[in-house]
Amino acid sequence: TIHGKSAHGMMPQNGINGATYLALFLSQFDFQGNAKTYLDLIAETLHKDFFAEKTGLAYTDPKMGELTMNAGVFSFSKESEDNTIALNIRYPQGVDTDAIKAGLEKLEGPKAVSLSEHGHVPHYVPVNDPMVETLLSVYENQTGLKGHEQIIGGGTFGRLLKRGVAYGAMFPGYVNTMHQANEFTEVEDLYRAAAIYAEAIYELI
Protein backbone atom coordinates (compact mmCIF):
# COMPACT_ATOMS: atom_id res chain seq x y z
CA THR A 1 0.00 0.00 0.00
CA ILE A 2 1.27 3.45 -0.92
CA HIS A 3 0.16 6.35 1.24
CA GLY A 4 0.23 9.82 -0.29
CA LYS A 5 -0.18 13.20 1.33
CA SER A 6 -2.22 16.01 -0.20
CA ALA A 7 -0.79 19.50 -0.65
CA HIS A 8 -1.82 22.70 -2.36
CA GLY A 9 -1.20 22.62 -6.11
CA MET A 10 1.20 25.56 -5.81
CA MET A 11 3.37 23.70 -3.26
CA PRO A 12 3.67 20.10 -4.54
CA GLN A 13 6.96 19.71 -2.68
CA ASN A 14 4.98 19.71 0.59
CA GLY A 15 3.01 16.61 -0.39
CA ILE A 16 3.69 12.98 -1.20
CA ASN A 17 2.53 11.98 -4.68
CA GLY A 18 1.37 8.39 -4.24
CA ALA A 19 0.88 7.96 -7.99
CA THR A 20 4.47 8.73 -8.92
CA TYR A 21 5.77 6.53 -6.11
CA LEU A 22 3.57 3.71 -7.44
CA ALA A 23 4.97 4.22 -10.94
CA LEU A 24 8.49 4.19 -9.52
CA PHE A 25 7.76 0.83 -7.88
CA LEU A 26 6.08 -0.68 -10.95
CA SER A 27 8.78 0.49 -13.36
CA GLN A 28 11.18 -2.14 -12.00
CA PHE A 29 9.03 -4.90 -13.50
CA ASP A 30 9.05 -6.11 -17.10
CA PHE A 31 6.24 -4.08 -18.65
CA GLN A 32 6.16 -3.63 -22.41
CA GLY A 33 4.80 -1.17 -24.97
CA ASN A 34 2.59 1.69 -23.84
CA ALA A 35 2.68 0.58 -20.21
CA LYS A 36 6.47 0.72 -20.08
CA THR A 37 6.58 4.11 -21.80
CA TYR A 38 3.95 5.49 -19.43
CA LEU A 39 5.59 4.19 -16.26
CA ASP A 40 9.10 5.22 -17.31
CA LEU A 41 7.99 8.79 -18.04
CA ILE A 42 6.45 9.09 -14.58
CA ALA A 43 9.21 7.31 -12.68
CA GLU A 44 12.22 8.82 -14.45
CA THR A 45 10.98 12.33 -15.24
CA LEU A 46 7.89 13.38 -13.30
CA HIS A 47 8.60 11.76 -9.93
CA LYS A 48 9.55 14.51 -7.43
CA ASP A 49 10.10 16.98 -10.29
CA PHE A 50 8.36 19.75 -8.37
CA PHE A 51 10.18 22.59 -10.13
CA ALA A 52 10.20 20.99 -13.61
CA GLU A 53 13.96 20.61 -13.72
CA LYS A 54 13.92 17.14 -15.27
CA THR A 55 11.28 18.20 -17.78
CA GLY A 56 13.43 21.14 -18.87
CA LEU A 57 10.89 23.80 -17.90
CA ALA A 58 12.59 25.14 -14.75
CA TYR A 59 12.40 28.92 -14.46
CA THR A 60 12.71 31.45 -11.64
CA ASP A 61 11.55 35.06 -11.75
CA PRO A 62 13.31 37.41 -9.29
CA LYS A 63 9.97 38.73 -8.00
CA MET A 64 7.48 35.90 -8.50
CA GLY A 65 9.74 32.96 -7.76
CA GLU A 66 9.90 29.48 -9.25
CA LEU A 67 7.70 27.69 -11.73
CA THR A 68 6.11 24.67 -10.02
CA MET A 69 4.68 21.48 -11.49
CA ASN A 70 2.33 18.93 -9.97
CA ALA A 71 1.55 15.69 -11.80
CA GLY A 72 -1.94 15.37 -10.41
CA VAL A 73 -4.24 13.21 -12.54
CA PHE A 74 -3.32 9.94 -14.26
CA SER A 75 -5.41 7.80 -16.60
CA PHE A 76 -4.16 4.54 -18.13
CA SER A 77 -5.77 1.49 -19.69
CA LYS A 78 -3.92 -1.27 -21.50
CA GLU A 79 -6.68 -1.30 -24.13
CA SER A 80 -6.39 2.43 -24.79
CA GLU A 81 -4.09 4.45 -27.00
CA ASP A 82 -5.19 7.65 -25.22
CA ASN A 83 -3.46 7.39 -21.84
CA THR A 84 -3.01 10.74 -20.14
CA ILE A 85 -1.17 12.61 -17.41
CA ALA A 86 -2.50 16.00 -16.29
CA LEU A 87 0.16 18.43 -15.09
CA ASN A 88 -0.73 21.43 -12.94
CA ILE A 89 1.91 24.02 -13.83
CA ARG A 90 2.05 27.37 -11.99
CA TYR A 91 4.35 29.73 -13.86
CA PRO A 92 5.63 33.28 -13.15
CA GLN A 93 6.08 36.21 -15.47
CA GLY A 94 8.78 35.49 -18.03
CA VAL A 95 7.24 32.17 -19.09
CA ASP A 96 4.39 31.59 -21.49
CA THR A 97 2.25 28.63 -22.49
CA ASP A 98 3.96 28.27 -25.87
CA ALA A 99 7.30 27.67 -24.16
CA ILE A 100 5.72 25.18 -21.76
CA LYS A 101 4.06 23.24 -24.59
CA ALA A 102 7.25 23.21 -26.66
CA GLY A 103 9.25 21.93 -23.70
CA LEU A 104 6.82 19.11 -22.95
CA GLU A 105 6.77 18.06 -26.60
CA LYS A 106 10.52 17.41 -26.39
CA LEU A 107 10.07 14.74 -23.73
CA GLU A 108 10.50 11.13 -24.71
CA GLY A 109 7.17 9.33 -24.42
CA PRO A 110 4.25 11.72 -24.95
CA LYS A 111 2.61 11.49 -28.37
CA ALA A 112 0.77 14.78 -27.97
CA VAL A 113 0.59 17.74 -25.58
CA SER A 114 -2.54 19.83 -25.06
CA LEU A 115 -3.02 22.83 -22.79
CA SER A 116 -5.97 23.98 -20.72
CA GLU A 117 -5.07 27.47 -19.54
CA HIS A 118 -8.14 28.56 -17.55
CA GLY A 119 -7.15 32.17 -18.33
CA HIS A 120 -4.67 32.21 -15.46
CA VAL A 121 -1.77 34.27 -16.76
CA PRO A 122 0.75 35.52 -14.16
CA HIS A 123 -0.58 38.46 -12.13
CA TYR A 124 1.64 40.84 -10.15
CA VAL A 125 1.02 44.19 -8.46
CA PRO A 126 4.18 46.01 -7.27
CA VAL A 127 4.72 46.59 -3.57
CA ASN A 128 4.94 50.36 -4.17
CA ASP A 129 1.41 50.48 -5.59
CA PRO A 130 -0.61 52.92 -3.39
CA MET A 131 -3.24 50.30 -2.61
CA VAL A 132 -0.65 47.72 -1.58
CA GLU A 133 1.12 50.32 0.56
CA THR A 134 -2.19 51.07 2.31
CA LEU A 135 -2.90 47.40 2.97
CA LEU A 136 0.58 46.84 4.41
CA SER A 137 0.25 49.94 6.59
CA VAL A 138 -3.05 48.68 8.02
CA TYR A 139 -1.50 45.29 8.76
CA GLU A 140 1.38 46.93 10.58
CA ASN A 141 -0.97 49.19 12.56
CA GLN A 142 -3.17 46.27 13.64
CA THR A 143 -0.46 43.73 14.45
CA GLY A 144 2.65 45.72 15.28
CA LEU A 145 4.52 43.54 12.80
CA LYS A 146 6.41 44.62 9.71
CA GLY A 147 4.35 44.09 6.57
CA HIS A 148 5.86 42.74 3.37
CA GLU A 149 4.67 41.53 0.00
CA GLN A 150 4.34 37.79 -0.52
CA ILE A 151 4.20 36.07 -3.89
CA ILE A 152 2.16 32.87 -4.15
CA GLY A 153 1.43 30.39 -6.91
CA GLY A 154 -2.20 29.95 -5.94
CA GLY A 155 -5.04 31.40 -7.97
CA THR A 156 -6.96 34.11 -6.08
CA PHE A 157 -9.83 36.48 -6.82
CA GLY A 158 -7.24 39.26 -6.82
CA ARG A 159 -6.50 38.50 -10.46
CA LEU A 160 -10.02 39.57 -11.43
CA LEU A 161 -8.95 43.21 -10.96
CA LYS A 162 -6.03 44.89 -12.71
CA ARG A 163 -4.64 46.03 -9.34
CA GLY A 164 -6.22 43.31 -7.24
CA VAL A 165 -4.25 41.40 -4.62
CA ALA A 166 -4.93 38.66 -2.10
CA TYR A 167 -4.85 40.04 1.46
CA GLY A 168 -4.54 37.65 4.39
CA ALA A 169 -5.34 35.88 6.41
CA MET A 170 -2.32 33.83 7.47
CA PHE A 171 -0.45 35.15 10.50
CA PRO A 172 3.07 34.20 11.67
CA GLY A 173 3.01 30.72 13.18
CA TYR A 174 -0.17 29.80 11.29
CA VAL A 175 -0.66 26.06 10.76
CA ASN A 176 -1.35 25.79 7.03
CA THR A 177 -3.89 23.04 6.32
CA MET A 178 -5.13 24.60 3.09
CA HIS A 179 -6.81 22.04 0.77
CA GLN A 180 -5.94 19.19 3.13
CA ALA A 181 -8.04 16.82 5.19
CA ASN A 182 -9.52 18.52 8.27
CA GLU A 183 -8.70 22.01 7.02
CA PHE A 184 -9.17 24.58 9.79
CA THR A 185 -8.29 28.03 11.09
CA GLU A 186 -8.17 29.44 14.61
CA VAL A 187 -11.16 31.52 15.75
CA GLU A 188 -8.78 34.14 17.17
CA ASP A 189 -7.24 34.54 13.72
CA LEU A 190 -10.70 35.20 12.28
CA TYR A 191 -11.21 38.03 14.78
CA ARG A 192 -7.80 39.52 14.00
CA ALA A 193 -8.44 39.29 10.26
CA ALA A 194 -11.87 40.92 10.58
CA ALA A 195 -10.34 43.91 12.38
CA ILE A 196 -7.67 44.27 9.69
CA TYR A 197 -10.20 44.03 6.87
CA ALA A 198 -12.48 46.60 8.51
CA GLU A 199 -9.69 49.17 8.79
CA ALA A 200 -8.43 48.38 5.29
CA ILE A 201 -11.86 48.98 3.77
CA TYR A 202 -12.16 52.25 5.72
CA GLU A 203 -8.77 53.48 4.50
CA LEU A 204 -9.36 52.48 0.88
CA ILE A 205 -12.73 54.20 0.52
Where are these regions (language model features)?
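Glycine-rich, charge-dense phosphate/pyrophosphate-binding loop(s)
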Residues: 53-55, 133-134, 158
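Long, highly charged amphipathic alpha-helices
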Residues: 20-24, 28, 99-106, 134-137, ...
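Midchain, well-structured core segments that form catalytic/ion-binding scaffolds
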Residues: 1-94
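Conserved active-site and cofactor/substrate-binding residues in soluble primary-metabolism enzymes
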Residues: 13-24, 66, 95, 99, ...
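Zn-dependent metallopeptidase/amidohydrolase metal-coordination segment
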Residues: 79, 136-204
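Substrate-recognition/cap regions that form aromatic- and gly/pro-loop-enriched pockets
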Residues: 76, 83-154
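A short small-residue
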Residues: 2-8, 113-118, 174-181
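A common structural junction motif
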Residues: 29-33, 105-111, 204
